[in-house]
Amino acid sequence: MKLNVDLENHSYPIYIERNAIQKVHEYIPVSRKIAIITDTGVPEKWVNIVKQQCPDSFICTIPQGEPSKCFDQYKKLLEEMISHNMSRKDAIIAVGGGVVGDLAGFVAASYMRGIDFYNIPTTVLSQVDSSVGGKVAIDMGSYKNIVGAFWQPKTVIIDPNVLSTLSFRQQHNGLCEALKMGLILDDHLVSLFEQETLDIDAIITRSIELKRDVVQQDERESNLRKILNFGHTIGHAIESAYGLNTYLHGECVAMGMLFFIEDEALKQRVLNIYKKLDLPQVPDYDTATLLEYVTHDKKSSHKTVSTILVKQSGSYIIKELSFKEIQEVLERGPYEK
């Protein structure tokens, strides 16, 4: 299946197909120097399949995990590219999850003022969400995605077969972002999670269609695209304060969504899905600590936070909440009846 992302200054295809990783040479011009950026968590067989199709390529491997989205790894990748005499006509292919895509994309955006970037996401989380849209970034200390850019890929290749090597926890972590998409935009997508057997292909495809539609309307997150931050305001705070070595990103987003689902019947429906996915509960937290992270989040402006509220599955409300109101939400907690 091929979807097109049509933007004002740049459009690109998304290929969603089993065994698509075997066809990289058909989807990407490979007759140039290519840096393949991956991490230690990606099985070598996927990386090697890509490399075998790119005759003049080299592999850059970063340590697995969020801590690699940092200036040190960013600098090392730039040095590696310089040592291989890469030019503006060369390209980067990311083979990995969201961390690899974010870091590789930011390197592509800044090396020689920008070179071609291709993304082959290998996790559910990156396939349903982060690989599409052009948001690339690195962290600074415990502040997530604080340094970054908008740099659209030239092509995205999504092969559900590569998910077979992931643990169930990693798969379910990624599905949280797909569920988020359904809660704000499409109740049918939510209903896919309530089926006895999860149809991963259907969930991925519908999530990408929804993400594509939002990005086409608001490429640079000036208005509509903010809805994709549902669950991230408090989710990022939990991840930064407690979760970088404990919880996965999607798990934190799932926690964050609970604070802003305003219908108790819907919240119970969502909690039933969480139980099915074996997601962790919101940990005990210090309100002041989380509030500190919220106030430094890039979604905050002056003394308010642009917040997404959900009262009915498939729809949303955007509301500016004061820091005081966020404090009250935190004090109330996610499970209050």
Model-flagged regions — what are they?
Residues 99-106, 127, 236-237:
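Short glycine/serine/threonine-rich phosphate/pyrophosphate-binding segments
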Residues 83-89, 111-119, 240-250, 265-268:
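Phosphate-handling active-site elements
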Residues 192-289:
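Active-site segments that bind and position negatively charged phosphate/pyrophosphate groups
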Residues 13-15, 21, 29, 106-195, ...:
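A glycine/threonine-rich phosphate-anchoring loop and its flanking beta-alpha core
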Residues 1-91:
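ATP/NTP phosphate-donor binding region
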Residues 6, 85-87, 110-111, 139-140, ...:
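Solvent-exposed alpha-helices and their adjacent loops that cap or buttress functional pockets
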